[in-house]
């Protein structure tokens, strides 16, 4: 089958399924999701076997430890996937929600309700759990989805889609509701981006190269899950009891994800900078240090200006020393990708200036950047974290997979 025929076949299947999905009852959708959660746990052995194939390929390709961690599925992560699906099932169904109701002076009755977007295409890398998260969110919100995962997670994604399809078949629902792109060659992606009548939105989540590729080639609206160059500023008035736990968690807990801190900004008036750097080194973090920090911790490496713009997704951290809040804010303006910025301070006025001066999807005070996540925000899961400003910003959850239709009821009115 030629590329264009393959693409149009998948897109047409999704479009057809979307017409049925928008009419499914909440109870039917929830039944499917709860059955899927149970099946993920029941068939975990099959999932782990498929994941082992991906991990084996990853080792042969010499993927970094952080990327291997993103790829890894274990029993705990499978149960976590199942739990996320149950959380999505428990969320209120946004479809049909009335966002506005009004009777006009001429007697016309206007009711605006939430409706599905239609067909959502998501392109992602490495993390197999995205397959389930996005599939479940799309299904619950009445959307068909086209999922194109990275080649490094092919076998894991394949088995997860298979299990989803088993449930759909059992419940007599079109498997076009969740479409899997089983071609990993990038040349197969471009024809998808031309299907303006069949796909309603494209969501790329991955590295800078993927985001640029999709943005430059798509004729379909794109919601970008761009790179996470997250900045964490330690103010001179930061509480030392909070600093080390927050910084360690922000960098070390899962370095291979987009809400991990990449730039640590230290006010030179903070008295425990050396202890903080030593604590990070003890956790295995490779420190890229400016001259001031290097003087405190000579075992680090000199930082390059380009490092401050990098999303490492690894146990590497760039450090910048500043002498004022204004200098910290100027640095963040130059380096931020618009994802997450955080401050640790006990000065409420400093915190207020920090948050009022910056323009990112999330701004945190005295807590880890790792909290910028759909699950942590109470959304159940997320399609991605949008760093753009149109359609949605921040975690893209159920409600963000909807648009609105206004229903107007009259009694013979005409416009004068």
UniProtKB/Swiss-Prot annotation:
A Gene Ontology biological process annotation? L-proline biosynthetic process
- Record field: catalytic activity: L-glutamate 5-semialdehyde + phosphate + NADP(+) = L-glutamyl 5-phosphate + NADPH + H(+)
Mind listing the GO molecular function terms for this protein?
A: glutamate-5-semialdehyde dehydrogenase activity; NADP binding
On whether Nucleus is a keyword of this UniProt record, the answer is: no
Q: Please state what class of enzyme this protein is.
A: oxidoreductase
Under InterPro entries, the record lists: Ald_DH/histidinol_DH (IPR016161), Ald_DH_C (IPR016163), Ald_DH_N (IPR016162), Aldehyde_DH_dom (IPR015590), G-glutamylP_reductase_CS (IPR020593), Glu-5-SA_DH (IPR012134), GPR_dom (IPR000965)
Query: Could you tell me where this protein is found in the cell?
Result: Cytoplasm
Q: What pathway, per the record?
A: Amino-acid biosynthesis; L-proline biosynthesis; L-glutamate 5-semialdehyde from L-glutamate: step 2/2
What Enzyme Commission number does this protein have?
Answer: 1.2.1.41
Q: Which Gene3D superfamilies does UniProt cross-reference here?
A: Aldehyde Dehydrogenase, Chain A, domain 1, Aldehyde Dehydrogenase, Chain A, domain 2
**Sorted alphabetically, which keywords does the UniProt record give?**
Amino-acid biosynthesis, Cytoplasm, NADP, Oxidoreductase, Proline biosynthesis
Gene Ontology cellular component?
Answer: cytoplasm
Q: What does this protein do?
A: Catalyzes the NADPH-dependent reduction of L-glutamate 5-phosphate into L-glutamate 5-semialdehyde and phosphate. The product spontaneously undergoes cyclization to form 1-pyrroline-5-carboxylate.
| Name of the featured protein | Gamma-glutamyl phosphate reductase
| Recorded name of the encoding gene | proA
């Amino acid at each position: 089958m030629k590329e264009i025929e393959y693409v149009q076949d998948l897109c047409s299947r999704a479009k057809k399924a979307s017409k049925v999905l928008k009419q499914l009852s909440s109870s039917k959708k929830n039944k499917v999701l709860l059955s899927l959660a149970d099946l993920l746990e029941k068939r975990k052995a099959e999932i782990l076997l498929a994941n082992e194939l991906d991990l084996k390929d990853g080792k042969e390709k010499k993927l970094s430890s952080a990327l291997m961690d993103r790829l890894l599925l274990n029993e705990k992560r499978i149960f976590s996937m199942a739990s996320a699906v149950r959380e999505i099932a428990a969320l209120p169904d946004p479809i049909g929600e009335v966002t506005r109701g009004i009777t006009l002076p001429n007697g016309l009755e206007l009711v605006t309700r939430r409706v599905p977007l239609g067909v959502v295409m998501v392109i992602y890398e490495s993390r197999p759990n995205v397959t389930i998260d996005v599939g479940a969110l799309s299904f619950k919100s009445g959307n068909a989805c086209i999922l194109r995962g990275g080649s490094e997670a092919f076998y894991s994604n394949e088995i997860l889609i298979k299990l989803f399809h088993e449930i759909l078949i059992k419940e007599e629902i079109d498997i076009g509701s969740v479409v899997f792109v089983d071609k990993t060659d990038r040349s197969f992606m471009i024809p998808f981006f031309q299907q303006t009548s069949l796909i309603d939105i494209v969501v790329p989540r991955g590295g800078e190269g993927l985001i640029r590729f999709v943005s430059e080639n798509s004729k379909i609206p794109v919601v970008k899950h761009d790179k996470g160059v997250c900045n964490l500023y330690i103010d001179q008035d930061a509480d030392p009891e909070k600093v080390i736990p927050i910084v360690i968690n922000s960098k070390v807990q899962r370095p291979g994800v987009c809400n991990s801190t990449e730039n640590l900004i230290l006010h030179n008036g903070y008295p425990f900078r050396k202890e903080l750097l030593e604590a990070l080194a003890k956790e295995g973090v490779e420190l890229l240090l400016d001259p001031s920090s290097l003087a405190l911790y000579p075992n680090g490496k000199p930082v390059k200006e380009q490092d401050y713009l990098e999303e490492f997704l690894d146990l590497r951290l760039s450090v910048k020393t500043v002498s004022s809040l204004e200098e910290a804010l100027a640095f963040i303006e130059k380096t931020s990708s618009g994802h997450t910025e955080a401050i640790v301070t006990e000065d409420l006025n400093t915190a207020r200036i920090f948050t009022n001066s910056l323009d990112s999807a999330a701004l945190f005070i005295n807590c880890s950047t790792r909290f910028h996540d759909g699950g942590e925000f109470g959304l159940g899961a997320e399609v991605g974290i949008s760093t753009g400003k149109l359609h949605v910003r921040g975690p893209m959850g159920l409600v963000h997979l909807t648009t609105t239709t206004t229903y107007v009821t009259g009694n013979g009115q005409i416009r004068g």
